[in-house]
């Protein structure tokens, strides 16, 4: 059921930013109110990222009002806050399809709209890409402007500072908007600071500023004195010294919910030369009390009733793999004070809330800094402690060199608890955990495990934690297990799988949580099923035995086929000169789009029906 746009009379006038720029400035607060309500009513029906968008309403309206999008470059970091941007850029009537199969993409996406200048999803990429676009715009010389919007979390990543350091060196015309949505508004925000921001960004101040620099440019001591004086005056009322040192002209902080003041400040800043940084303070979840009070829980939401102000509880009573991990952490830490758990800003998602409260001295949230997280763990291991890096599969990609250079080469005992392995679902291409088995399998000294259920996950985490001869990775999926009873912790034999079902002719070598589908298919085809458990080292003895006893081997994994566990089986068989037909089933050579997890598995032939169909087709071909 679509939303009746007639209930939003000002928003109804705005299909695109061109329409927005025709509105009188005085109508913008009304537009913001309607846009906020529209976002509430749409996301509550569709699910999606919520609190961030509520906090970015005024900024979104002001940016599209002042800048000539899509001619000007507007880049959103991560993209959680970009739902209002999508609503204002011709996608209002489809916003209720966001994150669904064949619906709007959850993040800004270049193939979806000319207003989306950069595909995003991972953090802290906006300033680097924006800097490249700004340099290209200068070469183009058509007056195109570039704006990057980045949050206070994303700007903590090293990549953002690398980009700002470079921008300060080459001095392009660009604007970085720091959307600071901490829980409380800064003391500096208010009438005085809003007025100061407009003054410091105004023509008179900037003319005097640049003119003075030109006059005294030949007298280095005086030029330096002017620079220090300016920084001192600004430093008395604004916290921008760090950004000034990087070469940015800092303006702010200002109230990010005063759309009229934002429009004035952005208008003043639009034609300033060199790198500019506008620091705005916003409230995550603004305008909806439950989200304001608990922005973490309301960051990404299922469908809910806006009138009740409560989020529905999951109907699945089985624990998630993330919770299994978090509970195991607490159980292990209870008897080992050398356990150190690390997360790059994913405490809630990784199931570490309980651990962080019960063992605060052994818990480290290093912010959005995956590279640092891994090398920090390496240092802890060298110091005699037992580090565990809890990280999503898709984010481990950002720390690949550190895994190799700082951990594996030195054979350091670091346990990688890799969450969201395989198909993640609604967040789409940027968040599927499709590649970890492939990019980890080729690293020497690395042990890799993939559990088939939640009990096996616990045992593998325990095994990896107590293995002290090198790094270990345990990868597990998003979502709940199958309800397997949890057994007391014990170490598994390294590199050994087990037979789950004995059959004939066909042997399915399963890696990970597709085991129920494998067993379902095996019942129909009377196939053998092996729960391989280890991707590296492979159970050579078991694989060769299955190859000798069966006509066809089928490898099954929720990872890219190229370079994955099945590729490892192929390599082993070739090395042993064992000639047997092998069917590799897994993720194809494409970036897996958004949709429900079960929808995607069905589309890719990784549900029981698809697996059976693929095996029968391969079997028929082999018999010709």
Swiss-Prot record:
GO terms for biological process: 1-deoxy-D-xylulose 5-phosphate biosynthetic process; isopentenyl diphosphate biosynthetic process, methylerythritol 4-phosphate pathway; terpenoid biosynthetic process; thiamine biosynthetic process. It comes from the Bacteria. One of its GO terms (molecular function) is thiamine pyrophosphate binding. It catalyses: D-glyceraldehyde 3-phosphate + pyruvate + H(+) = 1-deoxy-D-xylulose 5-phosphate + CO2. Thiamine diphosphate binds at residues 80, 121-123, 153-154, 181, 288, 370. The keyword S-adenosyl-L-methionine does not apply. The keyword ATP-binding does not apply. Its cofactor is Mg(2+); thiamine diphosphate. Pathway: Metabolic intermediate biosynthesis; 1-deoxy-D-xylulose 5-phosphate biosynthesis; 1-deoxy-D-xylulose 5-phosphate from D-glyceraldehyde 3-phosphate and pyruvate: step 1/1. Gene3D superfamilies: 3.40.50.920, 3.40.50.970. InterPro entries: Dxylulose-5-P_synthase (IPR005477), THDP-binding (IPR029061), Transketo_C/PFOR_II (IPR009014), Transketolase-like_Pyr-bd (IPR005475), Transketolase_BS (IPR020826), Transketolase_C (IPR033248), Transketolase_CS (IPR049557). Pfam families: DXP_synthase_N, Transket_pyr, Transketolase_C. Binds 1 Mg(2+) ion per subunit. Binds 1 thiamine pyrophosphate per subunit. GO terms for cellular component: cytosol. Its EC number is 2.2.1.7. Mg(2+) binds at residues 152, 181. Keywords: Isoprene biosynthesis, Magnesium, Metal-binding, Thiamine biosynthesis, Thiamine pyrophosphate, Transferase. Coiled coil: none annotated. Belongs to the transketolase family. DXPS subfamily. NCBIfam families: dxs, PRK05444.2-2. Homodimer. HAMAP family: DXP_synth. Catalyzes the acyloin condensation reaction between C atoms 2 and 3 of pyruvate and glyceraldehyde 3-phosphate to yield 1-deoxy-D-xylulose-5-phosphate (DXP). This is 1-deoxy-D-xylulose-5-phosphate synthase. It comes from Proteus mirabilis (strain HI4320). The lineage of its organism: Bacteria, Pseudomonadati, Pseudomonadota, Gammaproteobacteria, Enterobacterales.
């Amino acid at each position: 059921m679509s939303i009746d746009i007639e209930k939003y009379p000002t928003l109804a006038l705005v299909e695109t930013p061109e329409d927005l720029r025709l509105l009188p400035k005085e109508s913008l607060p009304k537009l913001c109110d309607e846009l906020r309500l529209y976002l509430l009513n749409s996301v509550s029906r569709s699910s999606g990222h919520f609190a961030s968008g509520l906090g970015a309403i005024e900024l979104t309206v002001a940016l599209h009002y002042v800048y000539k999008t899509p001619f000007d470059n507007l880049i959103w970091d991560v993209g959680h806050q970009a739902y209002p941007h999508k609503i204002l850029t011709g996608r209002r009537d489809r916003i209720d399809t966001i994150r669904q199969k064949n619906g709007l993409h959850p993040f800004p996406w270049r193939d979806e709209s000319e207003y989306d200048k950069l595909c995003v999803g991972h953090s802290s990429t906006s300033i680097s890409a924006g800097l490249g676009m700004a340099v290209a715009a200068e070469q183009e010389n058509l007056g195109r402007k570039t704006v990057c919007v980045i949050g206070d979390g994303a700007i903590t990543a090293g990549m953002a500072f690398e980009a700002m350091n470079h921008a300060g060196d080459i001095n392009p015309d660009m604007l970085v908007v720091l959307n600071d949505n901490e829980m409380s508004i800064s003391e500096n925000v208010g009438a005085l600071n809003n007025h100061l921001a407009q003054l410091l960004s105004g023509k008179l101040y900037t003319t005097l500023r640049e003119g003075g620099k030109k006059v005294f440019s030949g007298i280095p001591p005086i030029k330096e004195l002017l620079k220090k004086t300016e920084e001192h005056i600004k430093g008395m009322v604004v916290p921008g010294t760090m950004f000034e040192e990087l070469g940015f002209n800092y303006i702010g902080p200002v109230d990010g919910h005063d759309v009229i003041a934002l429009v004035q400040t952005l208008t003043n800043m639009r034609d300033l030369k060199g790198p500019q940084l506008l620091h705005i303070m916003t409230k995550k979840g603004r305008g909806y009390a439950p989200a304001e009070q608990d922005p973490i829980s309301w960051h990404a939401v299922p469908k809910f009733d806006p009138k009740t102000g409560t989020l529905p509880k999951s109907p699945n009573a089985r624990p998630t793999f993330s919770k299994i991990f978090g509970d195991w952490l607490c159980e292990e830490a209870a008897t080992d004070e050398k356990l150190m758990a690390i997360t790059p800003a994913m405490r809630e998602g990784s199931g570490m809330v309980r651990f962080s409260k019960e063992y605060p001295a052994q818990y480290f949230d290093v912010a959005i800094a995956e590279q640092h997280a891994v090398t920090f763990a390496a240092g802890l291991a060298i110091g005699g402690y037992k580090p565990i890096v809890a990280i999503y599969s898709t984010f481990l990609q950002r720390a690949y060199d550190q895994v190799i250079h700082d951990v594996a080469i030195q054979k350091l005992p670091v346990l990688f608890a890799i969450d969201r392995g395989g198909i993640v679902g609604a967040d789409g291409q940027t968040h599927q955990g499709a590649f970890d088995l492939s990019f980890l399998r080729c690293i020497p000294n690395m042990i890799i495990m993939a559990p088939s259920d939640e009990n096996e996950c616990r045992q593998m985490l325990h095994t990896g934690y107590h293995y002290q001869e090198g790094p270990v990775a345990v990868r597990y999926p998003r979502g709940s297990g199958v309800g397997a009873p949890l057994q007391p912790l014990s170490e598994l034999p390294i590199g050994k799988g087990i037979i789950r079902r004995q059959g004939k002719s066909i042997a399915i070598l399963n890696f990970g949580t597709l085991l129920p589908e494998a067993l379902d298919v095996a019942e129909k085809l009377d196939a053998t099923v092996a729960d391989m458990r280890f991707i590296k080292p492979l159970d050579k003895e078991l694989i060769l035995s299955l190859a000798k006893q069966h006509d066809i081997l089928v490898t099954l994994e929720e990872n890219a086929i190229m370079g994955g566990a099945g590729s490892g089986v192929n390599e082993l068989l070739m090395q042993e000169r064992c000639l047997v037909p092998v069917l590799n089933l897994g993720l194809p050579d494409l970036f897996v789009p958004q949709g429900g997890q079960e929808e995607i598995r069905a589309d890719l032939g990784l549900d029981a029906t698809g697996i059976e169909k693929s095996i029968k087709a391969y079997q028929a071909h082999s018999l010709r």
